[in-house]
Amino acid sequence: MGLNLLPIEMDDIRKRLDREPNEIEWRVIDAVWSEHCSYKSSKIFLKSFSIDSPNVIMGIKDWQDAGAVDIGDGWAIVIKVESHNHPSAIDPFNGAATGVGGIIRDIISKGAKPIALMDMIRVGNLKIRKNVWLLKNIIAGIAAYGNSIGVPVVGGELSFDDTYNDNPLVDVAAIGIVRKDKIKPSIVDKAGLKLVLAGLTGIDGLGGASFASRKLSGEDEIGAVQIADPFAGKIILDVTLEIADKVEAIKDLGGGGLAVAVTEMANGLGAIVDIEKIPLRVKNMDPADVIISETQERMLYAVEEKNVEEVCKAFEEYEYPCSVIGEITSEPIIKFRYFGKDLVSLPTNALLEPPKFLWPIKNVRKNVEEKNVDLSLESTIYTVLSHPDLVSKEWVYSQFDYEVNTSTVVKPGDANGAVVSLPNGKLLAIKADGNPDLCSEDAYECGKGIVAEAYRNLATVGARGMVAVDHLQFGDPKKPEVYYTFVEAIRGIGEATRFFNIPIVGGKVSFYNENSQGKPIKPTPLIVMAGLVQGKLLKNRVEDSSYVVLLGYTRKELGGSLLSKIFKVPSQAPKVRLQEDLLSSEVVIDAINEEKITFAKDISRGGLAASLFNIIVHGYGVEISTKSILSDTDNVVENLFSESSGRFVILTNEPEWIVEKSRSKGIVASIIGKVNKKTSILTIDNTDYDLKTIVNNYFNFLEEVIGNG
C-alpha cells in the first residue's frame, strides 16, 4: 500500500478499532496521521509558544488554519506561513505556485481578504545549473500565481547554501484583513450542517501529505505534486469572501485532501461524505483517490441547509463546480460512502489523536576554541560583500506585481521590512527572518536571534512587533542530532517571544528535509513578524555629510557569521542579549518619531561592513574610524564582520541626540563616520577601498546568473 506509518502506529489503530482497517481506511489514516498533518513529533513542544494576549483572537491554542490578531477599530489581521519544499524540489513551478495558492486559501478560510504575500526562498549553490533552474522556476511559479490572483508580493528572503542543493526551501507567508466580528472558524460546533465542496477533484497531489512526511527519493514522485490554476484560485477567493456570511465554517483542502479536511472540520463530531457527489476532473477515478487527492483550488464549507442554494449559486455565476457532498453528524464517526456503501468508517477522535512521539536527542552544540582572525582586510571586504546572500534581490522583486491593490507603502528592497496600508488608516510592517548558519552552530541562540532580528527589522521602519508565526524546517526527527536542534530552536524562539511579549499565533513544522542520501539540511527555523508603525514611518534615504552612528556593542562573536562560513573561522556563536535588542529598537523607533534619522539598518548578515555597503549602493561613499567602534576586540576584521545582535547603523544629522538618547535607554552608541560623495568608496581608518566592482555585482548578479540561465 506504500504507507508511511510506523509499525507501532499500525498496532495502535488496530487496538483502538479492535479490527484491521481496510485498504482505503489505511490510506486515510496514513494521510491524517502524517507528520505533515498531525504534528505528532512536534505538537507537545509547540504548546510552549502560547502567550496569553488580549489582542489574540485566534491563536496557537485554537490550532486552526491561520492566526488572527486585533489591530483596533474593529479590524483584525490574519497571518499564516506555509511551505511547499518537497513539491518544489520535484516540480519547482507548480510546487511554488501551489504553495502561494494554498496559503491564500488559508487566509480566506478565516473570511479575510489577502493583502500581502512574502516569499522566503533557499536554494543550493548557483554554480550548479540545476539550482539555477530550480530558482528560476520557483520565482516564476510564485509570480504566476500571485500576479494572476491580484495579491502583491511585498518582500521576503533569498539565500544560498550547499545544504539546499537537493532540497530547496520555499516558504510563503500571507497577511489578510477582516472585521474582527466576521472571522470564520475552520471547525464546527454542531451537527446537521451540510458539507459543500467547491472545485473539481483530480488525480494530482495523490499522497502529498505522506510525500511531505518522508525524505525525497527521486523524480518518480511527480504525481504527488499538485497543479496550480490561479484563475480558479481567483474565483475561490472572490466567491468565498462573498459568501462568508452565509457559511458556518470554511476549510481549505490542503494536505491529505478531503480525508483531513472533513476530519478536522468535524472537530470531534462526525461526518458522512458521499463520494459519488464529488465533482471530478477525471472520469472513473478510484474512490480512494478521490478521498486523499490534493487537487488545488478547492474549498470545503459547512453550511446551514437554508443557505446551501445561495452558496452554490454564487459559484454557478462563474460556472465553477459546487456540490453538497455530505453533512456533519452527531455520531463521532467519519464515513466516506460510495453509492451507499461505507468505504471508510473511523472514529473521529482516533483520527484526531495520533500517537505522539518524543524522539531521542543528542547534544550537538559545538565548543569552539577561539583563535585570532588573521585575514587580509581588503580581500575579506571584497570576498564577503560579493557573496550572493548580500546582492540586490531587485531582479526577483521585478517579477512580482508588488503594487497591485495599491496598498504597498514601502516597496520590496527599499527597507528592512515591508509596509502595507490598512483600512483603518494604520500601517502594518512585516518581516521574515531565518539564519541557518547560526542554527547549525547553536540552535538555541539562533531561535532567540531570529525573533530578535525580526523585531529589529520592524523597528527600522518605525514599527513595534506585535504578532508572529513560525516555520520550523529540519531533517528527520528520528535522528537524535536533528531532534536536538529542533527542540533547542523551539526553546530559543519561545524564550524570545515571551520576552518581547509577541504571541505566536500559528505556524508550520516541516521535517524530512533531506537529500536522497539522507543528509539533512541545516536547521532552518523561520520567523515572520508583523507590527504596527508606532507613529512616523521611516523611508530610508541617504544624504551627503550625514553622520554614521553605530548603535549597540560589538563583540568578537563570529560563529555562524558569513565571514566564518566563507573563511572557516572558528569562533563562538553570538549570545543573543534580548534586553539590548529591545532597548536599541526603542531608540530607533523614538528617533524615527522625532525625525532625527534618515536611514536605519539592523546589523545582521555580513556584519557592520554589509550594513555600510547598504549605504554605499545608494551612490555614495562612507568613511569610518574603527577606533570609534565600542567593542571587546581591537581586530578590525572582527569589528567589521561580527554579527552580534542588538545593533543598528543609522544616518543622522544630529548624532549627539542619538548618543544621548541611547545613553538614557542604557544602550551604547558611537559616531563612527560620515557619508560622502566618493561614489562606491569605503574608507576605513583613512584607507580607501574601491567597491565599484562589488556594487556592479550587487545590482547585476542575479540577472546575469538567473535571468540568462
From Swiss-Prot:
- This chain is encoded by the gene named purL
Which amino acids does the record list as binding Mg(2+) 2? Answer: 106, 252
What is this enzyme's EC? 6.3.5.3
Which residues participate in Mg(2+) 1 binding?
82
State the family it belongs to.
Belongs to the FGAMS family.
Spell out the protein name for this chain: Phosphoribosylformylglycinamidine synthase subunit PurL
The enzyme's main class, written as a single word, is ligase
Natural source organism: Saccharolobus islandicus (strain L.S.2.15 / Lassen #1)
User: Which residues participate in substrate binding?
Assistant: 83-86, 105, 226, 294-296, 510
